[in-house]
Amino acid sequence: MIGTDENRAVLHVEVIFWSGKRKIPPSLVSGKYCPHFVVTGTTEYLGVCFLDGTECTFDTPALGNAQPLYPDTIDYAPLENNAEFLIYEGANAVGKGRVLGRTVPYKVKQQRKWVPYVPN
């Protein structure tokens, strides 16, 4: 699955950030919040970056879209639909979440380069 379009799928997630773990909730809309997801029952850190989402408040569900950061080197298959995960910043678990769905990037068909016909 590494390097495939399926591994590049944007993840639609529901997340909850716990109070007492951060001073303020993260901004999911800045495009700069890049935590790790660790799927329940595994230990592998899966780096993601939030593209957008709803405003976060502590201990309340928020919705967001996250993109895998390393689709060419790490297998993101464990983040399948309904997978539950913890959200880590470094070694600290700051929240939890669940995958609601995935959007695989649309494959764009290559256009043929037009070359004018030149008779001999």
Report each predicted region and the residues it spans.
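C-terminal effector/interaction modules appended to NTPase cores
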Residues: M1-N120
